[in-house]
Amino acid sequence: MSATISPTQHPHRVLLHNEIHARPPEAMSAPLAIAHIVMLADAAEREASRAHVAALLRDHHLALPDAGTTHLRMDLGAFRLRWELHTEFVSWTFMVPAAVESFGEREPVSAIASVPREWLAALPGQCLCSLNLWVLPTHTFGSGSLIKHVLHEDTLLASTVADGHGEVYTDFAIHADGFSRMVLLAGGMTQRRLGRLVQRLLEIETYRMAALLGLPAAREASAVLAFAERELAELANAIRTANRDDEPALLDRLTRLAGQVESQYAATHSRFSASSAYFELVDRRIKDIAESRLAGMQTIGEFMDRRLTLARSTCEWAARRQDALSQRVSRMSNLLRTRVEIEQQQSSQALLATMNQRQDLQLKLQSTVEGLSVAAITYYIVGLVTYLAKGGKALGWPLSPESTAAIAIPLVAVSVWLSLRRLHHRLFRKH
């Protein structure tokens, strides 16, 4: 047996490898009654849902999920459970065998009837979607039998699915029990194909509702954006006619408006991005079920395209308005800030020019003072020389004191001036 080389493994290798197998569809056999509930949940509620499913498994003496479990499938005897933990929501799917003989003749029995009521009422989060799906092992089932007790006639939709191997009926209405309803005629589909089709139908309803979460946010954002756009238009007009004294106040208003726009953007951007992703998933799942028109009925794809287009466009338009407004506010802020900075630079240059003029005046005054200083110092030194000449006269100094003073004046003046200039240069070199 050859030696196995085991290089260092990436810490996420197994997790990434198994992601392709995450949440696989399970093989199913008709007839089935399926109840699908989607609970919108924050991080704490998603964690609580793991504890909630663990409590149910504990009551049935089954193995509990570990802290990293994000989905599980379990047969609990009275019903089969499928639990999935998503980024924003938790899905609970309950399955039981369905009675086919009298289906359509009276109110159908939901799989939810087999689930413990108290445990069901305590599901963490808020219910976003609840759907009853009945899977029947027949090829055809008259729509007249469905509209009497199962679906609403005025909103009935139907199509063939799985390339003609099955039929699906729904009305996209919330009935008295709080659930929407769907009927799937499985015909002779294999168990795995049926499992894939059921999962896609459930995901269409789940992602449709998740995508529409962006619609209330878009409507609320539209009112805020309309106010911000009016405010920006007023600011643009005010900036155009503003003088220098008005600009700081305008810049403050513009800065506060930018903060408001960015706050709104931060609050809704992730919601709009998520809605866009969910809308794409709805499109993909509708394509996956491979439906075609049935007896002139409107298909699920046609209904979704007609009814969701407006909501989708509203969310996309709100996101584009936010981006455009943010860019406009940023551009106007930069322009006004540049204008203020240019005027500040001009003011600084004027101030520097004034300072230069003052410095020139100070230099002139300093030169005048230096001249007076030379005269004063020369006067005192010549006075001393005169006294010395008078004393020297008695000792034989040949010149009179007046002549000595006259000769000393230019010499003393030049010496004093040179000394002051030398001191002046020495001080300026130090600074």
Where are these regions (language model features)?
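N-terminal pre-transmembrane cytosolic regions of membrane proteins
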Residues: 1-129, 134
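Cytosol-facing regions at membranes
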Residues: 129, 189, 234, 281, ...
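Alpha-helical transmembrane anchor segments
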Residues: 360-431
